[in-house]
Amino acid sequence: MTSQLHKKGEAWSARFSEPMSELVKRYTSSVFFDKRLALVDIEGSLAHASMLAAQKIISADDLAAIQRGMAQIQGEIERGEFEWQLDLEDVHLNIEARLTALIGDAGKRLHTGRSRNDQVATDIRLWLRGEIDRIGDLLKGLRSALLDLAEQNADTIMPGFTHLQVAQPVTFGHHLLAYVEMFSRDAERMLDTRKRVNRLPLGAAALAGTSYPIDRHAVAKTLGFDGICANSLDAVSDRDFAIEFTAASALVMTHVSRFSEELVLWMSPRVGFIDIADRFCTGSSIMPQKKNPDVPELARGKTGRVNGHLMALLTLMKGQPLAYNKDNQEDKEPLFDTVDTVADTLRIFAEMVAGITVKSENMRGAALQGFSTATDLADYLVKRGLPFRDAHEAVAHAVKVCDDRGCDLSDLTLDEMKAELPNVAALLGDDVFGYLTLEGSVASRNHAGGTAPDQVRAAIAAARAALG
């Protein structure tokens, strides 16, 4: 006998007196984006079917048929031969319909003891777990590229900035290590998020669990989950893990964006600290001289995109009562695009960093401007017994004198320095000029976390060891 299901096409249509309108079908269908979950949907279904057979809920013959049918469907999907149908709403019903067409009633038994509510929650977690692992590898690749560039420039001196004003000299290697730290924290956050992703919702069914004697722990073990979601209502409605991942991704992109801003600035001819390889830049359709740093500029822009996805997911969840609601269909596109954006950005940045040309003489020249060793002169006086605030005031006066003359502190003779600083003249000796050199300044910051080249090399070695 032909059922209402087959007359109307939807898996739930027997309850209704008229078919869904075509407009509503297009509005509510998710198959053309959630088909991305197809392979993990099959993986989850096979684990569920194996458990059903082990619990004697379906027969061994049914299990064998399901496994055979799913293998064929997976092959069709991987070869691009699977025919996705809008009328079947989503990835789950498309696969189930194809399975039933291939193996008959055994395919109809697959959904025993589960709902699409716990099925999709499982699919997303399975998929996201793999993507977190991939992003972790990409973060590792970017950190490795940064460490290579830092190692090449452990002695390269550049100005360090606060408020975009020259502050103190640092090494370019030290500057790059700051980004290694940022991306290391990002990797830690991803791993921590993975712990909460890696819980199995399957078995929660629609919201209340199921009356069948299922074994959720067996399914969790088969699928590599650390455990099960403890509450069936929470299991089907929770999207904290997606929000948490997107928040971690927003921080990744924020760090990329900060680095991008510096790359754009450094590549500007008015700064000229670096050059980015041609393959990562574009020209102008009107100005023949232009070489534009499009990759870092676009990464800056894409950061706003990921931030927007985070806000979209937070807003999606803020008004939902327990348990599952159709609103949650809107979780996937922001999540999918976040993964794509972060993964593509990290991959291209690792390649771009490896192709950066450093203009060390320009960096050094910039560090010689702006009185970057003024703090070193103050420290020199403090080490000879002067209170720091008094030393600060004396050096500030010397800077004002040099600024008016258009010279640097190191351009003053010892006699000129003593004449301008009579209150500290007795503390000044010929050795003061060693403190005013760029090399002397960076070498003096020889402690853990400092910019001295020896410390930079030690930090690089430690970071490489942490990468494994």
UniProtKB/Swiss-Prot annotation:
The EC code for this enzyme is 4.3.2.1
Q: Which InterPro entries match?
A: Arg_succ_lyase_C, Argininosuccinate_lyase, Fumarase/histidase_N, Fumarate_lyase_CS, Fumarate_lyase_fam, Fumarate_lyase_N, L-Aspartase-like
Tell me where it resides: Cytoplasm
Give the pathway annotation.
Amino-acid biosynthesis; L-arginine biosynthesis; L-arginine from L-ornithine and carbamoyl phosphate: step 3/3
- Keyword terms, alphabetized: Amino-acid biosynthesis, Arginine biosynthesis, Cytoplasm, Lyase
What are the disulphide bonds in this sequence?
A: none
| UniProt key word Nuclease | no
Q: Please name the top-level EC class of this enzyme.
A: lyase
Which GO cellular component term is one of those annotated? cytosol
Q: Which GO terms describe its biological process?
A: arginine biosynthetic process via ornithine; L-arginine biosynthetic process
Known catalytic reactions: 2-(N(omega)-L-arginino)succinate = fumarate + L-arginine
Give GO terms: molecular function aspect only.
Answer: argininosuccinate lyase activity
The UniProt entry, under PROSITE patterns, shows:
FUMARATE_LYASES
Where mainly found?
A: cytoplasm
Family named by the database record: Belongs to the lyase 1 family. Argininosuccinate lyase subfamily.
Q: What is this protein called?
A: Argininosuccinate lyase
Q: Which organism is it from?
A: Paraburkholderia phymatum (strain DSM 17167 / CIP 108236 / LMG 21445 / STM815) (Burkholderia phymatum)
